[in-house]
C-alpha cells in the first residue's frame, strides 16, 4: 500500500481536469460475453462496423483479437513519450470476418443440415475461447476483457497527422473527430493494444467512446449511467469512476493499495483501464495433493501486468488471510461491493 501523498501520485494528462478510469477484477470474469453483446448492440451493429468489437473478452493465454495483437508494435519507446515505436496494421483476416449463417435454410426451408457459417472462417474475435495451456491437472486459462484504455499518453493521438484524435478536457476520454478523420489509419498502427478500428464504409477510424453519452446523462430521463459494458456485467467485475477521486474505489485500488494494474505497462501509454490480476487454485502433484505452486505462473502474469503484479497478488493474499482470521478489509470490501452508487462514481465532479 502506497505511503505517498495521494495528490502526488495521480498523473493527469496536460489539459485534462479529471481522468475517468475503469477497474476490472479478473477473478470475477466468467467469459459470458454480456459486455461484448451490450457494446456491440449499442455502438457497432452495422455500417462498416460488422467486424468491430470495441469491447471483447479474450481467453489468456491466447492470440487475442485481433490475432497476435501483442506482437503488432506501437506505443512509445520510453516513458519520456518523445518517440513512438513502429507498429503494424492488422490484416482483415486477423480480426475475422463477420460470420453469416444459414438461418434461412434451417428455419424456413426445412433443411436437415446443422446451423453453420456459410463461409469457411479461419479466425474470429473469440476463436480460441476456453483453450488453456499446461498439463493436466495443472492446466489453466482465464478471461481478459478489453476496451480502449483511454490512455494518459495515447500514442494514437500523436500518430494522427490530422489531429483528429484528442483527449476530452473534462474527463480524459479519448475520441476521434469524425469530421477531421480521413482514414489514414496511422492511429491503428500506433495503438499498441489495437483498439482503434478502420471503418471501410465510412472511410474513418472508430473506437470505444467510454459510452460518454451515458455518463453525461444524455438519455431520455437525464440520468447518469456507467458504460454499457460495466452496467450489464452479470458478475459485476467492473468499477468505474475517476482516478483523481480520492474517496472512490478506483483511486484506492490503483494508487493506495496498488492492486489494480495496467495491461502491458511497457507500452508506456499509461492506460486508464486497470486489472485486478487473477488468482487460481494451487497446482497438484501426481498423487493429487496440493502443492505450494501457483497454477497461473507468476512469470506469465508479469508479462501481462509488469513486475508490480507480485506485490499486488501478495497484498490481496494478505487481506484474504486477514478476513479468514475474522478481521475486516477495506480492500476486499471494495472488490465485493455490489452497490452501484459506490461501484460507479461518475458525478463527484459535476459542480466543477
Curated annotation (Swiss-Prot):
Optimum temperature is 70 degrees Celsius. Binds 3 [4Fe-4S] clusters per subunit. Binds 1 [3Fe-4S] cluster per subunit. Induction: By nitrate. [3Fe-4S] cluster binds at residues 160, 181, 187. Residues 63-95, 111-131 are annotated as: Disordered. Residues 78-95 have a biased composition (Basic and acidic residues). [4Fe-4S] cluster 3 binds at residues 148, 151, 156, 191. It catalyses: nitrate + a quinol = a quinone + nitrite + H2O. Its EC number is 1.7.5.1. [4Fe-4S] cluster 2 binds at residues 39, 208, 211, 229. Optimum pH is 8.2. At 40 degrees Celsius (temperature of natural environment) the optimum pH is 7.9. The keyword Metal-binding applies. GO terms for molecular function: 4 iron, 4 sulfur cluster binding; electron transfer activity; metal ion binding; nitrate reductase (quinone) activity. InterPro entries: 4Fe4S_Fe-S-bd (IPR017896), DMSO_Rdtase_II_Fe-S_su (IPR017839). Residues 20-48, 139-170, 172-201 form the 4Fe-4S ferredoxin-type domain. The keyword Iron-sulfur applies. GO terms for biological process: anaerobic respiration; nitrate assimilation. Its cofactor is [4Fe-4S] cluster; [3Fe-4S] cluster. [4Fe-4S] cluster 1 binds at residues 29, 32, 35, 233. It is a peripheral membrane protein. It comes from the Archaea. Inhibited by cyanide, azide and antimycin A. Enzyme stability is not dependent on salt concentration. Keywords: 4Fe-4S, Cell membrane, Electron transport, Iron, Iron-sulfur, Membrane, Metal-binding, Nitrate assimilation, Oxidoreductase, Plasmid, Repeat, Transport. It is found in: Cell membrane. Probable multiprotein complex; a catalytic heterodimer of an alpha and beta chain is proposed to associate with additional subunits involved in membrane attachment and electron transfer. This is Respiratory nitrate reductase subunit beta. It comes from Haloferax mediterranei (strain ATCC 33500 / DSM 1411 / JCM 8866 / NBRC 14739 / NCIMB 2177 / R-4). The gene is narH.
Amino acid at each position: 500500500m502506497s505511503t505517498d501523498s495521494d495528490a502526488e501520485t495521480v498523473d493527469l494528462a496536460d489539459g485534462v481536469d479529471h481522468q475517468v478510469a475503469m477497474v476490472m477484477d479478473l477473478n470475477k470474469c466468467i467469459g459470458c460475453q454480456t459486455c461484448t453483446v451490450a457494446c456491440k448492440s449499442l455502438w457497432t451493429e452495422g455500417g462498416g462496423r460488422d467486424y468491430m468489437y470495441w469491447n471483447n473478452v479474450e481467453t489468456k493465454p491466447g492470440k487475442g483479437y485481433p490475432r497476435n495483437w501483442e506482437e503488432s508494435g506501437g506505443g512509445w519507446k520510453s516513458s519520456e513519450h518523445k518517440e513512438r515505436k513502429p507498429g503494424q496494421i492488422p490484416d482483415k483476416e486477423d480480426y475475422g470476418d463477420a460470420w453469416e449463417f444459414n438461418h434461412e435454410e434451417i428455419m424456413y426451408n426445412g433443411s436437415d443440415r446443422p446451423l453453420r457459417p456459410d463461409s469457411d472462417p479461419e479466425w474470429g474475435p473469440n476463436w480460441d475461447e476456453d483453450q488453456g495451456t499446461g498439463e493436466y491437472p495443472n492446466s489453466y486459462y482465464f478471461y481478459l476483457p478489453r476496451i480502449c484504455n483511454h490512455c494518459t499518453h495515447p500514442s494514437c493521438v500523436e500518430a494522427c497527422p490530422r489531429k483528429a484524435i484528442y483527449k476530452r478536457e473534462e474527463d480524459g476520454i479519448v475520441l476521434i473527430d469524425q469530421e477531421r478523420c480521413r482514414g489514414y489509419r496511422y492511429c491503428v498502427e500506433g495503438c499498441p493494444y489495437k483498439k482503434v478500428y478502420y471503418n471501410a464504409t465510412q472511410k474513418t477510424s472508430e473506437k470505444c467512446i467510454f459510452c460518454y453519452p451515458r455518463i453525461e446523462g444524455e438519455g431520455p430521463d437525464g440520468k447518469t449511467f456507467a458504460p454499457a459494458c460495466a452496467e450489464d456485467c452479470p458478475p459485476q467485475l467492473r468499477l468505474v469512476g475517476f482516478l483523481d477521486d480520492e474517496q472512490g474505489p478506483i483511486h484506492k485500488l490503483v494508487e493506495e493499495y496498488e492492486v489494480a494494474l495496467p495491461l502491458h505497462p511497457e507500452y508506456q501509454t499509461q492506460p486508464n483501464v486497470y486489472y485486478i490480476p487473477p488468482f487460481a487454485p494451487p497446482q497438484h502433484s501426481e498423487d493429487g495433493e496440493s502443492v505450494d505452486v501457483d497454477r497461473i505462473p507468476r512469470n506469465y502474469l508479469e508479462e501481462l501486468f509488469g513486475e508490480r503484479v507480485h506485490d499486488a497478488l501478495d497484498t490481496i493474499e494478505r487481506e484474504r488471510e486477514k478476513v479468514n482470521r475474522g478481521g475486516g478489509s477495506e480492500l476486499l470490501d471494495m472488490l465485493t461491493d455490489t452497490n452501484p452508487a459506490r461501484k460507479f462514481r461518475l458525478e463527484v465532479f459535476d459542480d466543477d
